[in-house]
Amino acid sequence: MNTTSNTSNIIVGLSGGVDSSVTAALLKQQGYQVRGVFMQNWENDDNDEYCSIKQDSFDAIAVADIVGIDIDIVNFAAQYKDKVFAYFLQEYSAGRTPNPDVLCNAEIKFKCFLDYAVGQGADTIATGHYARKEARNGVHYLLKGLDRNKDQSYFLYRLKPFQLERAIFPLGGLEKPEVRRLAAEFNLPTAAKKDSTGICFIGERPFREFLQKYLPTDNGKMVTPEGKTIGEHVGLMFYTLGQRKGLGIGGAGEPWFVAAKDLTKNELIVVQGHDHPLLYTRSLVMNDLSFTLPERPKAGRYTCKTRYRMADAPCELCYLDDETAELVFDEPQWAVTPGQSAVLYDVDICLGGGIIQTTDKPVIITR
C-alpha cells in the first residue's frame, strides 16, 4: 500500500511511456497535487536514428497536457554519464555484463530526480514501476509488483530507506493489461505505445555498433573447454554467459552456448547443449552490497533472482565481510553472470542484494 495523504505534493517522473502516463493520470484523478518531470538522461543527437529521447519528451508533454498538469524537462545527462555510463563501460572492459538500469534507478531516478523534486517542494515522487511499498511500524518495505510478469523490484533493490520513504508506485497493484485499459480510458496518447526495450541510452540500435564507439575490440579464438578452436569471436565484451545467438557456429548436434571468458588469453569458451555442466553453478560471491531496510538481513535462508524475470531460487546467505556475501543455492543455477545483480527476497519483500563477482563454476581450461 502506498501511504500518502491526498494533500501531498507529488512530482511524477514522466518518461513518455504508458506506465508513467497512467501513474500521473491516476494520481491527478485521486486529487493529489501533481506535477511532471521528464528526465533527459542522454544527450540527443538529431542525426541519431535510434535515439527516442526527443519523441519521448513530446509524448510526455502531450500526456501532461491531457492530464492537466505542469511538466518540467530536466537534464541529468552529466550525472548519468558520470554515475551510470562510466560504470557501464568499466564493467564491459573488465569482461563483465553490467545492468545499468539498476544503477540508473539508484543514482538518477531516485537520487538526482528525488533531490530535484524535494528542492521544488515535493513531498513525494512517483514512478511507473511495477513494484509495491508498505509502511509497517515506521519502516518502508519494497515489495514485488502484483503483476509477476512485470514485477520490477529486481531493478529497485539498491534503493535506500530514505529513498523508499519519499517514493510511491501507483501501478504496483495493477497488471499491465489493466494499465493499457486505463490509458485508453484517460485518452492518453501513449495508450498503444510500445514498451521500451533494451538499455535506455542504447535504444533499439545494434549493441555491437554502439559499444565499438567507446571501447576497443580485439578478435580472438572461440574454443571448447578442451582447447579445440571452433571459431572466432569479435571481442569478448560482446558476449554474455549463456548466450546462444550470434555465435556463428554451425554443424550438427545441439546448439552452442557461451560458458566462460578467458581474459588473459582473449578466448571465448563455448559448450554444446543447454544442460552442459559448465553452464551451471551452485554458489556465487557478490559484493557492493545494498539493502532496502535500515538493518541488513541476517544470514540465513532466502530466495534470490540472479536475472530479471527468473523464478525465485531458494538459497543460503552467508556474509564474508561487510561488503561481501556468498549465496549457496539449493539447486544449480543456469548462466549466473558476473556483473549482474543477485537480489534477495523474503517471500514478497525485496531485501536488497549485490553485484555478482564470481561463481563456483570452474573456469580452468583443461588442455
Curated annotation (Swiss-Prot):
GO terms for biological process: tRNA wobble position uridine thiolation. Pfam families: tRNA_Me_trans, tRNA_Me_trans_C, tRNA_Me_trans_M. It is found in: Cytoplasm. Residues 150-152, 307-308 are annotated as: Interaction with tRNA. The keyword RNA-binding applies. Coiled coil: none annotated. Residues 99-101 are annotated as: Interaction with target base in tRNA. This is tRNA-specific 2-thiouridylase MnmA.
